């Protein structure tokens, strides 16, 4: 039986952690002590110094020659069971998907062992359980986080290949990734160059696009055409990126009388549409500058029959209807251009689908720098056709739903990954629903070749061809090499990688030959690692305070995530531990460890790669709040 003294011991060890977290939360939300920039500095200190040195301290002082192999085997078996079930689910069921498999694996098997687990388990089951937790931390940092990174990079590589080489991927025999490309997470514009070798196979080079190196210099600067080609990752809907560029401050600084003159953003200058011609977005130019003669779409009539307004290049359902009205005013133009209609499937939807009507210009005649352009950018009016060139224009029509779920990538504008909003309905992004989307909707736009008519096709029109395209991938050895290159480049930039490996190497040397660390080095590490635990919880509190809401993904999804975290994980761990033969306190430690709150590193990866970040955010924040009573319930029940 668990005595009141045992409960008090546990609370004594855990409540101070929550005090640090609550102080950080109040410092931002209630007392306004820290600004977001200051919070960012604190979090960076914790990520680079405090947590790596804390993990180094625990790992270097733990005897690797006294590791409990059966306990490690049980933990490993739990993760293998979950991974195997998720692989089967993703490949052999209609509702399975790679994104959900990664998310469920993170929720069920990767708890916050370092910060929360070590002090909690030591208070519950003694010092030996703390040593077991350190062993779990070593495996997490060296093996399981690397595996998770491998899965994310596999997803990124698969998206890149499906977008750039939908028909010829099987002919790729090598990838060369330039040194400045760190990841395939979609943060940077990437372009691919394919060369045909003597053997008739493709040799692909992946590099950063010049557009990602440019900066938006000023409002009077005429945007120059970028050298973006069809072989480029545009990250339109798969990994939407929000910008911290403050347009209001920028325009005030440059002397504009009003606020932002239009919603033309720096990213738009180098988007898929703007690299092929001037495609202005709906502007509030006339509202701010009281220019009643300025048309709504930034379109300056030239009286020619070839003039037509440019629709919003973003896939936004809020501006689609307006764009259609403007396009329908010139029916002749609609008939003179090739058009492709994308059905969304025969199944009716609860939300009305809206028709997206847009034009795509060829990169051969980019009139942005050659012509006077739009008056918004300081150019003179063009008498020919109002600053627009319709040469090489291709017309695209597609039906898009008016709402999408967070974490699911459709051809609709999503909020930035840092917003964590809009996830109010629970649905797997599975194959059944994907059949109603445009082809490769989870990857954004298909490759738009300069000489093509942007032939976007729907999955419903492919039928059996979809399965054959999935098999149309490079050889496994080529894919593996590409992914390993990207994973290696990510790992060597992560301070936790060095702290874990150096700590393990030092422990192997120190406990083998009984070598003591020099006092100066030991005290230098100790003074920072001692603060690491409190600073990690403080940083978590800052993170909670900076979020718009604690439950960012909707109640139904949050309930599902908490069930996976606190029920599925411990249940699978119990099965694995019993199968390995753990009994007594070892079994209890294994189960309670599996019921710890969600780890922070999986959330960081989910945010970087934009794979259900709202769910992992809720798992970290809300999971931390309810973790103490849940672990106490497990502790009491297992002690009966």
From Swiss-Prot:
GO terms for molecular function: auxin efflux transmembrane transporter activity; identical protein binding; protein homodimerization activity. Residues 430-442 have a biased composition (Basic and acidic residues). Predominantly expressed at the lateral side of shoot endodermis cells as well as root pericycle and columella cells. Its main location: membrane. The modification Phosphoserine is found at residues 226, 243, 283, 366. GO terms for biological process: auxin export across the plasma membrane; auxin polar transport; auxin-activated signaling pathway; gravitropism; positive gravitropism; response to light stimulus; root development; root hair elongation. Changing residue 533 to F/W: Impaired auxin (e.g. IAA) efflux carrier activity. Residues 1-7, 60-71, 123-131, 522-524, 581-585 are extracellular. Changing residue 145 to A: Strongly reduced auxin (e.g. IAA) efflux carrier activity. Strongly reduced auxin (e.g. IAA) efflux carrier activity. It is a multi-pass membrane protein. Changing residue 49 to R: Disturbed oligomerization leading to reduced auxin (IAA) transport activity. Changing residue 51 to A: Reduced auxin (e.g. IAA) efflux carrier activity. Homodimer. This is Auxin efflux carrier component 3. The gene is PIN3.
């Amino acid at each position: 039986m668990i005595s009141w003294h045992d409960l008090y011991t546990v609370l004594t060890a855990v409540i101070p952690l929550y005090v640090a977290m609550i102080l950080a939360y109040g410092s931002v939300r209630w007392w306004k002590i820290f600004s977001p920039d200051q919070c960012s500095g604190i979090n960076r200190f914790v990520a680079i110094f405090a947590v790596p040195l804390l993990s180094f301290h625990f790992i270097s002082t733990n005897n690797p020659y006294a590791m409990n192999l059966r306990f490690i085997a049980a933990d490993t078996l739990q993760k293998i069971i979950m991974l195997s079930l998720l692989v089967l689910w993703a490949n052999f069921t209609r509702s399975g998907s790679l994104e959900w498999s990664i998310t469920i694996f993170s929720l069920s098997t990767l708890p916050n062992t370092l910060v929360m687990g070590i002090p909690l388990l030591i208070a519950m089951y003694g010092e030996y359980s703390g040593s077991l937790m350190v062993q779990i931390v070593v495996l997490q940092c060296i093996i399981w986080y690397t595996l998770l990174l491998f899965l994310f990079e596999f997803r990124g590589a698969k998206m890149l290949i499906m977008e750039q080489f939908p028909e010829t991927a099987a002919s790729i025999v090598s990838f060369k990734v330039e040194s400045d490309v760190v990841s395939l997470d979609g943060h940077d514009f990437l372009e691919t160059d394919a060369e045909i070798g003597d053997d008739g196979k493709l040799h692909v080079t992946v590099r950063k696009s010049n557009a990602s190196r440019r900066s938006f210099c000023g409002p009077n600067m005429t945007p120059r055409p970028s050298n973006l080609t069809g072989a480029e990752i545009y990250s339109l809907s798969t990994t939407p990126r929000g910008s911290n560029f403050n347009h209001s401050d920028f325009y005030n600084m440059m002397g504009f009388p009003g606020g932002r003159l239009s919603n033309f953003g720096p990213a738009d200058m180098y988007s898929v549409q703007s690299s092929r011609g001037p495609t202005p977005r709906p502007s509030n130019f006339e509202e701010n500058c009281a220019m009643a003669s300025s048309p709504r779409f930034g379109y300056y009539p030239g009286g020619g029959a070839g003039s037509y307004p440019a629709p919003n290049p973003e896939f936004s359902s809020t501006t689609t209807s307006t764009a259609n009205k403007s396009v329908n005013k010139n029916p002749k133009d609609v008939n003179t251009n090739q058009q492709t209609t994308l059905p969304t499937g025969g199944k009716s939807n609860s939300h009305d689908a809206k028709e997206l009507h847009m034009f795509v210009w060829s990169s051969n005649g980019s009139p942005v720098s050659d012509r006077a352009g739009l008056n918004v950018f300081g150019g003179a009016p063009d008498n020919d056709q109002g600053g627009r060139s319709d040469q090489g224009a291709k017309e695209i029509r597609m039906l898009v739903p008016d709402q999408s779920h967070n974490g699911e990538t459709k051809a609709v504008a999503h909020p930035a990954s840092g917003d964590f909003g809009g996830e109010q309905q629970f649905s797997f992004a599975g194959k059944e629903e994907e059949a109603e989307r445009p082809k490769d909707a989870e990857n954004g736009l298909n490759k738009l070749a300069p000489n093509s008519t942007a032939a976007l096709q729907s999955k419903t029109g492919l039928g059996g061809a979809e399965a054959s395209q999935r098999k149309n991938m490079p050889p496994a050895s080529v894919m593996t090499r590409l992914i390993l290159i990207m994973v290696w480049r990510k790992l060597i930039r992560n301070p936790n990688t060095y702290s874990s490996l150096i700590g393990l190497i030092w422990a192997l040397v120190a406990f083998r030959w009984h070598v003591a660390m020099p006092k100066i080095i030991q005290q230098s590490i100790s003074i920072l690692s001692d603060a690491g635990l409190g600073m990690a919880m403080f940083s978590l509190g800052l993170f909670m305070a900076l979020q718009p809401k604690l439950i960012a993904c909707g109640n139904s999804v949050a309930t599902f995530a908490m069930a996976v975290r606190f029920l599925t994980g411990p249940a699978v761990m119990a099965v694995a531990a019993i199968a390995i033969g753990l009994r007594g306190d070892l079994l209890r430690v294994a189960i309670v460890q599996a019921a710890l709150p969600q780890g922070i590193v999986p959330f960081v990866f989910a945010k970087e790669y934009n794979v259900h970040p709202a769910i992992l955010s809720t798992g970290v924040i809300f999971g931390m709040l309810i973790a103490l009573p849940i672990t106490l319930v497990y502790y009491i029940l297992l002690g009966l």
